[in-house]
From Swiss-Prot:
The chain crosses the membrane at residues 4-24, 75-95, 108-128, 154-174, 181-201, 233-253, 272-292, 308-328. It comes from Francisella tularensis subsp. mediasiatica (strain FSC147). HAMAP family: NDH1_NuoH (MF_01350). This is NADH-quinone oxidoreductase subunit H. Its main location: membrane.
Amino acid sequence: MLGYILWTSLYVLLIVIPLILVVAYYTYAERKVIGYMQDRIGPNRVGSFGLLQPIFDALKLFLKEIIVPTNSNRYLFFIAPILAFAPAYAAWAVIPFSKGVVLSDMNLGLLYILAMTSFSIYGIVIAGWASNSKYSLFGALRAGAQVISYELAMGFAIVGVVIAAGSMGITGIIEAQSGGIWHWYFISLFPLFIVYFIAGIAETNRAPFDVVEGESEIVAGHHIEYTGSRFALFFLAEYANMILISILTSIMFLGGWNSPFQATALESIFGFVPGVVWLFAKTGIFMFMFLWVRATYPRYRYDQIMRLGWKIFIPLTFVWVVIVACMVRLGVGPWW
């Protein structure tokens, strides 16, 4: 029993610590990439090429004074960042990085992840209410409505994948896509693939769906009153969710750790590449897409975001799920 606890604790640390480092340097990559897209250099002063910038940013945040608004609900004000941070990292417990390399290989892994990603909204809403600020509350209300709207579309997209794969376990979904790139679901479930990733951008409150913290309207939304380490927790949760959406998109639609050269003449050449390398390469593509979209599109109005979710994404995914269910039931379609 003690050995199991120690092993589990070690595995958790092996996931959380590298993930926090990836989050830190993801912020650096974001500033660099968007800087180049805008014909700027980006951070280049702290360390060679600015590589130490994330470390000093973290030190700055964690050494700052924690200011609590006078009329805020002190206890909920402190709990809210933890409620946002914990689910964002707990969801990684069921993510398989390669065959057998997973903390908990659950049969209902996708359901667990959906629950964890939905639970993080409580931290945002509580932060907005407990801060006793109208701007924080407006941001929290927007976040609640936005997450509910796009969670439904994401849920339908996941249902389509589950029907096609015949499994709610993440490992089962990856194995169902083995056999080469033509077996990956981004081809047969292309509308669900597009909707899932765009809904993931909206769910993480990233541009162009960042009305939750629209600087020109409500200053900084739900974390306007947060400073220091409490603000850092929200920051870490947001970027961890971005990476989670990226890796889930890779797993559900791009075959996870499966090589794109399976069942081809190139399989013998690339057969030595570990599955985790393919998974991280695919994840990196979607992480870059988050940054590219932010640098390209202006912020949508709130009514446009709601219309996109309720009038386009939800009906589209619902209809496609029905089509997929009928095709699977009748034995028709590209599920080899």
